Amino acid sequence: MTKYDPRKNAEGYNDPTPYAAEKHMMAQIRGKQARVAGGYFENIISASCDYYLSRGLAKIEKTPEPMKPLGAKNRKGQFLACYTKQAQPDYGGTLKGGRSIYFEAKHTDDERIEQRRLTQEQQDDLEAHHKLGAIAFVLVSMSLTDFYRVPWPVWRDMAEFYGRKYMTHAELSRYEVPATAGFIKFLHGIESEVLGKEATT
């Protein structure tokens, strides 16, 4: 017979304190909210990419996330898989005239965005594209209301520019790009500089 342990539940697992249980539940809720917000952010970016393509200004696509099957397909044709390490930026493509563009997209509901939101592999890849002459940046969403295009050199050298490895809402303001419902003009400024005057009309 198993000895009774008041710290464990009927299944034999450690019973969390009410505080720990609530903390875990809140973390799950925040995680779900972040996934929903991130998905909405991606949808807005996709709509923006479609807009630029329709005007013949750029072809920019989301980089597919590579998956590794963990087993054979079942009778329904389904299989389990996991995402493999992602090194490529979230989005990449070509601007009118041939110049390449690559960027990461990061959403936050906080009042600041941290440099560590990019993995080392993602940073290395953006750096490589930047060195080869591509336009590289991080597109930041704050609460899905304010959007910023942070040039890669600024993101990379954040500690040098700001004395720390994060940027506040106020510090991001100089990189803000216009947005309307369902569309982010993340090429604002780049349009006239690289694509010509017709891009700003």
Name what the model sees in each region.
Residues 151-201:
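Intrinsically disordered, low-complexity terminal regions enriched in charged/polar residues
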Residues 61, 102-105, 139:
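Short, conserved beta-strand edge motifs with alternating hydrophobic and charged residues
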Residues 127-157:
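Nucleic-acid nuclease catalytic cores
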Residues 24-82:
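Acidic-basic catalytic patches of nuclease active cores, encompassing PD-(D/E)XK
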Residues 108-132:
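Mg2+/Mn2+-dependent nuclease catalytic core
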Residues 89-93, 97-110:
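Conserved catalytic cores of phosphodiester-cleaving nucleases, focusing on short active-site segments
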Residues 72-78, 104-112:
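Short, basic, glycine/proline-bearing loop/turn elements
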